[in-house]
Amino acid sequence: MIKIDFGCGASKKPGFTDVDILKLDGVDIVHNLTSFPYPFEDNSVDEIWMDNVLEHLPNPMRVVEELWRISKKDTKITIAVPYFRSHYAFIDPTHVNFFGVNWFNYFDPRHVFWTKMQYSHARLNVDKFVFDREWTDNNTCGFLHRMLINFAKRRPNTYESKLSHLIPLNSLTFYLTVIK
């Protein structure tokens, strides 16, 4: 089973092959993620993890297409990014892309964005997305923060269009499944 952590940095994810642009301790493969193709065969990867990387890459649609190329059918892909309204999205000068709740719908054939636009041949089911995973996973979320996350989860488009500019959440984690 091949599991890849793209843009791992210095943190080693157990059971994953770690890919980063820098040769840091724990990095298994040094590769620039703006250089295509990635050093993996078509249909060879079983699971992909990408934590706070996609916002640094100038062509995120091409990156997603490359992840799709190397993935097997039903590969699980987890991608975490700063939420576009968050101040974290803008404090890092190396961030070149910004993400809202509907960004991956352009790859999901169940969604009108994919059926009307078809910008890409890559197809992914958007299984779910989670706001502020790093807070909820560690159970460090206060009562009001948790209420806001729960509202945004139940009514993501309402939150994004009406409330997020007033009370922005920090991050989005997308859980995707490859369709082939």
Pin down the residues of each PLM region.
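S-adenosyl-L-methionine-dependent methyltransferase catalytic module, highlighting the catalytic core
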Residues: 61-62, 66-68, 72, 76-180
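Conserved SAM-binding loop
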Residues: 2-85
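Short, Lys/Arg-enriched, disordered terminal segments
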Residues: 1-2, 180
